[in-house]
Amino acid sequence: MEQVVIVDAIRTPMGRSKGGAFRNVRAEDLSAHLMRSLLARNPALEAAALDDIYWGCVQQTLEQGFNIARNAALLAEVPHSVPAVTVNRLCGSSMQALHDAARMIMTGDAQACLVGGVEHMGHVPMSHGVDFHPGLSRNVAKAAGMMGLTTEMLARMHGISREMQDAFAARSHARAWAATQSGAFKNEIIPTGGHDADGVLKQFNYDEVIRPETTVEALATLRPAFDPVSGTVTAGTSSALSDGAAAMLVMSESRARELGLKPRARVRSMAVVGCDPSIMGYGPVPASKLALKKAGLSASDIGVFEMNEAFAAQILPCIKDLGLMEQIDEKINLNGGAIALGHPLGCSGARISTTLLNLMEHKDVQFGLATMCIGLGQGIATVFERV
């Protein structure tokens, strides 16, 4: 079986969905920009040698519809002979895109793939056109489709207080801002054209979603966003609404070395699981445990984790049940997470994996794990190993 390696990984800056940098930039353009950039950064690989493109996107309608992967590839002037497919596993879409490409390479059906994902939540809102079947309520709670309420349930079940949530959210912004100031994101962010507040076209090379002024005291003043009577989850402890894309160049190890391309990491194991939709945010726990089992590792073997911060009240129970509460500041989301950077649904899996690779190199650790919860009760995880 072929070894699957990540040769390169990049992303756009994360733009605010409300009147942000990419308010006049389409999702296909964000995607095409990264496809072109990955190929330009790795000239040893000819675009025509790509076997497939796997691109995650959740709201596949309007500008994100009709197979955005192919539309973006055509815009990027990828040769017409290279196919492309759009992948949808809700929040886990671009990580699923990575898994799909990895399996193709493992079986010998592909040697080189572009993977990634995009979501322009400013142009195509998360709830656009959603119409749940009324019969679902016979099998799952009606609130299972409301992510904020499922998070309130997790918080109550695991004793996650409002104070714990506010502290974690403030940490996310502080760490993301520190990473920005230190240049930690420089190797992953590709400058991307957008418009500033005055409408002037400019290149953005930073995440405009981060709020460096965030404090626990300010967060404590916010009202509950989903359960106004007894809730603890606020807008400030939820992932920000943002627009962005991320991409990775995935190859067989033999092809990468043949072309003289240096692999950054191997895909050691992959896992996807289902869980109760009423506590959809708990999915990273069984997904991570399964991925670790497949890799023959334990949580203590992992040097750094990237866990998507859908909500502070969602990630904290996962950290607790993976036995990592005492290691948050040494291992978990060291450059902040989605509370500060946002969670453009189809982009996030590739985004957290990209950040993880850079952290693994910076911290000089052998193993890293990226994981995320998925709406309606799923979890996905990937274990990476430095080469």
From Swiss-Prot:
Q: For this UniProt record, give its keywords in alphabetical order, as a comma-separated list.
A: Acyltransferase, Cytoplasm, Fatty acid metabolism, Lipid degradation, Lipid metabolism, Transferase
Q: Does the keyword Coiled coil apply?
A: no
Pfam family membership, one: Thiolase_C
Q: Record's Gene Ontology CC terms?
A: cytoplasm
SUPFAM superfamilies under this entry? Thiolase-like
Q: List the disulfide bonds.
A: none
Q: Where in the cell is it found?
A: Cytoplasm
Enzyme active site? 91, 343, 373
For this chain, one GO molecular function annotation is: acetyl-CoA C-acyltransferase activity
- Which top-level group of life is the source organism from? Bacteria
Q: What EC number(s) does this enzyme carry?
A: 2.3.1.16
Which pathway does the protein contribute to? Lipid metabolism; fatty acid beta-oxidation
Summarizing the function annotation, the protein's role is: Catalyzes the final step of fatty acid oxidation in which acetyl-CoA is released and the CoA ester of a fatty acid two carbons shorter is formed.
**Record's protein name:** 3-ketoacyl-CoA thiolase
Organism listed in the record: Escherichia coli (strain UTI89 / UPEC)
Phylogenetic lineage:
Bacteria, Pseudomonadati, Pseudomonadota, Gammaproteobacteria, Enterobacterales
